[in-house]
Amino acid sequence: MYKKKIARLALCTALCALVTTSVFASPTKAKAKSHPRQPVKAVRQTAKAPAGYTHKQAVHDSATLRIGIREGRGSVAVTGPQGLGVYRGDMLWKKAAANVPVTIALSGTNLTVNGDISTVPVQVRSLVHGGSVKITDGYAYRGALEMMKSPGRWGLTVVNVLPVEQYLYGVVGKEMSPSWSEEALKAQAVAARTYAIAHKSRFSQRGFDLTDDTSSQVYAGINGESPSIIKAVNATKGEIITYQGRP
């Protein structure tokens, strides 16, 4: 935990060097009014960060993360406001109408989906592109929810599989108040993205990349989103901090 705090402190130091100048140093009031975003762009390209740190766009649009959101559960029920599809691999296996629960349970080493056996993990997705899946006793999520037998222990593991940028929508607002300044939220978005990429696959033996709690970054799915957070994440799309070439 101490090492984790030191790493985050170093990352924040680098971000301050790259962002703070854009917040406090406009050449003239007239120029600031006519080109409000120009100082930010210039700082991102030219500001001098601590030795070894680089601010760059390095995360591809197609990059995804696997976030562990449940472990050791006997069963999980999910719903979707636009209906759900249950997939085995790339094959659509079952459908459920809008807001009709789908229950996935563990049966020996297999899964059951509304009572029907599956010998392989399943993914539950909205039937509508951009839709959501909600755990009935928890949060709603973008992307897919993958259900599998928990590796090395009893029970089900539930993994949220989604693009990095959409993951950040549900993270940044749990690390910082959505009411903070736009530049502060952008800096936090870069920090959170950098952390996610640097620690990807940390929990691979448990079937996912990151947890949804303080062991990684607190993640609340769609329930953690707000317009100001989404705006900050989109404005810094793909940007991370590297130290000596590594996140």
Name what the model sees in each region.
Residues 2-247:
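Conserved, single-site charged/polar hotspot
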